[in-house]
Amino acid sequence: DRPLELKPLTWLDRVDVLPASLDLAATEVIMNTTPGREFLFREIIRGLEKKYDHILIDCPPSLGIITQNALMASDFVIIPTDGNYFAMKGIEKIHYIIGLLRRKLGAEVRILGYFMTKYNAGRKLDVDIRESLIETLGESVFETTIRNNVALGEAQYNACLLYTSPSPRDRS
């Protein structure tokens, strides 16, 4: 009954990764027409719980059926934001969707925290946005940030994990 059989790759000892692929993209199309579509990931993950201590689901920056499935299957969500206007509106939308999934479908997901991406500590605007996030969201904003780095785009372009990027400087 699974939309597609998606096979994880072993990345490091005790770490498997299910990279983005055309099969994964096609899954969303199939999921949209499947009854009980919001619960598909939950069912798959229940079958994997004994194999893994933790399962991390990296979602696209959308609130489509894959993200909804991830929220329904998860205990916690960590929300990345680059701090721009649309990302801030996206945080409002994800709060709304989480509330809706809780009320309508019994989701148990809780927000663990937020972190900034594309962050440049030397740029006043980024520092101001981060301070604004902390004012709005409080202690749930992680100290950890993902800096603005060309290596991130290069790894995505080369379809490889940043950790396995061809350039050693990209792994710093």
Language-model regions: role of each:
Residues 1-50, 105, 109, 154-157:
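P-loop/Walker-type NTP enzyme "switch/lid" segment
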Residues 17-19, 116, 143-145, 164:
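Structural signal for conserved beta-strand scaffold positions within catalytic alpha/beta enzyme cores
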Residues 163-172:
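Single conserved hydrophobic/aromatic residue that forms the stacking wall/gate
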Residues 159-161:
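Short glycine/proline- and charge-enriched loop/turn segments
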Residues 22-24, 31, 119, 146, ...:
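Hydrophobic pocket-lining residues within nucleotide cofactor-binding pockets
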Residues 7-8, 30, 34, 87, ...:
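Alpha-helix initiation/capping motif
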Residues 49-144, 150:
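Conserved catalytic-core segment of NTP-binding enzymes
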